[in-house]
């Protein structure tokens, strides 16, 4: 039996593509437009990121560029995956949906988690993670979902049966789909918790980055709670399952771009603020001053209160003196102006003898 071609679609087009052009079901065209705009925006950010590398003054912001590029790849994949849910479910779109949905979101949430971990150190004035460590954390966290998805696909498809997803009943398919995303839900909770820790610190400049992650995760959690709730409702019309999932993909993709990518790009070229780091000058750092026992320990002694100072060797310690201590001056040599003296006459004795003779 021949099916009627919907208004807006050309003749000879396969029925699974009708949602892309059917004017009667406008949601497909709307989501297609939103997803296409997201793809273009993501590509624009990815092309802009290498150009901004030379303009980033802060080395710790520059360390995040590879991880943020990986994040943009995940966002680009999310917008691209939206088309797999607009197109009808069959042997090709079924494995794609189950395999890529969790992997792409695990990449995005892992990048946000790695960024949040680095921010928890920066906001407390500690040494941040290196570029390779941040990128390694993001890749490592996302690989777990890859293993889970591959194992599920292989076991479910039994290696060759690609139509198994379309053959499953809608409730069973939805349950398997949500259970497959258990690790992604764990990543979301962990990232949200870690982003809240970025508000606990004395260096407020890095809290703005933490606020971007916190807001992104808060909105993402709201979207996920909404679509999982609708998908698991027993009395809900199952014809809208693809609409719910494709809408969740497009909405979450734009949340990533507007709540995280855009403000982060705006902060990339911001001038390095010295207040965002611990003071490196030793003069300004609090230090342990060597105790001067002659000053502090003798300042309130009863003897010095009465005498005013105490002599120890050649140094006088005053109770409230500075570190320039008083010292005894060496005794000065006495001198006097020479005066004229009358010398006794050599004939004094002679004259006395003469008179006595």
Swiss-Prot record:
Subcellular location: Cell membrane; Cytoplasmic vesicle membrane
Positions glycosylated per UniProt: 158
Domain of life of the source: Eukaryota
Keywords: Cell membrane, Cytoplasmic vesicle, G-protein coupled receptor, Glycoprotein, Membrane, Phosphoprotein, Receptor, Transducer, Transmembrane, Transmembrane helix, Tumor suppressor
Record CDD domains: 7tmC_RAIG1_4_GPRC5A_D
Extracellular side: 1-33, 90-97, 151-176, 234-247
One function term, GO molecular function aspect: cadherin binding
Tissue-wise expression: Expressed at high level in fetal and adult lung tissues but repressed in most human lung cancers. Constitutively expressed in fetal kidney and adult placenta, kidney, prostate, testis, ovary, small intestine, colon, stomach, and spinal cord at low to moderate levels. Not detectable in fetal heart, brain, and liver and adult heart, brain, liver, skeletal muscle, pancreas, spleen, thymus, and peripheral leukocytes. According to PubMed:10783259, expressed at low but detectable level in pancreas and heart.
Post-translational modification: Phosphorylated in two conserved double-tyrosine motifs, Tyr-317/Tyr-320 and Tyr-347/Tyr-350, by EGFR; leading to inactivation of the tumor suppressive function of GPRC5A in lung cancer cells. Tyr-317 and Tyr-320 are the preferred residues responsible for EGFR-mediated GPRC5A phosphorylation.
Upregulation: By all-trans retinoic acid (ATRA).
GO BP annotations listed: negative regulation of epidermal growth factor-activated receptor activity; signal transduction
Name of protein: Retinoic acid-induced protein 3
Species whose genome carries this gene: Homo sapiens (Human)
Gene that this sequence comes from: GPRC5A
